[in-house]
């Protein structure tokens, strides 16, 4: 097991990474205010891992209540969130009860938002079970649900008490989900860690083959990058915005195509290629670097072209992005592999041409 730390002063918390951490109640118990938890999971992850987590906690004297949500991005909404509140109220959970998210990014985002708002805040623990949630969404305290007009538009910053990333849960992860998670790993290499990008170019097939050492390295290196950024800029006033490389385009894809039709990582991959193309057109990124970025995404089994939505639809959806400031669209772009910038000066016609060049 490897432990990293998210340095947020008196709200600092550890990230425990390794096989079997799910079964170790001793990693959870110190962070409980009382001997009571409520677990939020879904109908895919629950049958695989709920009994193990519940058994470990109950053996340690902890009372466990559970709510199982329907799986998928299409359910990340008020209606599903209310199922969590229904359980918390029906079982008389208190402000001191700890909410545990057992699942991928959708479960973590919704459980975290429930924890942030139930009785104005209850303790929260992340147990991510997908590659994407282990390397990205479980760390940093972003919680949200979707709105028909935009992804993650209703939410809060709310940090977990501890993150348990059990790498053995990736053994049951579908190949498509594994590949989608790699989009976020590649992102860290592109925005701030060129050595990670080089490593991925050399070892991407090992990660796809789920070699334990390669997976562990990719997860640990990604979490270390995320932890550093979050510690420096918790509420996304500066550097943390760079973690959104590809996300402005990607969220437009997810919203425009209907939540769940494109996985988040797939949309981020296509969005990253749009950002790379725009960076090239602005004279920042060389054609050779764009080709390297595309080649790595292709080897990872990720899309490098977005869906053929009208450019006007992309731009309309992107106008709802959370990084828009005073009506100006701010995009995360690349000066080089390993150096990202937040840029608000790109002309709409150049943005549109970049989108058009990267639509299938």
From Swiss-Prot:
Its EC number is 4.2.3.4. It comes from Aromatoleum aromaticum (strain DSM 19018 / LMG 30748 / EbN1) (Azoarcus sp. (strain EbN1)). It catalyses: 7-phospho-2-dehydro-3-deoxy-D-arabino-heptonate = 3-dehydroquinate + phosphate. NAD(+) binds at residues 71-76, 105-109, 129-130, 142, 151, 169-172. One of its GO terms (molecular function) is metal ion binding. Binds 1 divalent metal cation per subunit. Can use either Co(2+) or Zn(2+). One of its GO terms (cellular component) is cytoplasm. It is found in: Cytoplasm. Pathway: Metabolic intermediate biosynthesis; chorismate biosynthesis; chorismate from D-erythrose 4-phosphate and phosphoenolpyruvate: step 2/7. Zn(2+) binds at residues 184, 247, 264. It holds the Pfam family DHQS_C. Its cofactor is Co(2+); Zn(2+); NAD(+). This is 3-dehydroquinate synthase. Keywords: Amino-acid biosynthesis, Aromatic amino acid biosynthesis, Cobalt, Cytoplasm, Lyase, Metal-binding, NAD, Nucleotide-binding, Zinc. The gene is aroB. Catalyzes the conversion of 3-deoxy-D-arabino-heptulosonate 7-phosphate (DAHP) to dehydroquinate (DHQ). Belongs to the sugar phosphate cyclases superfamily. Dehydroquinate synthase family. One of its GO terms (biological process) is amino acid biosynthetic process.
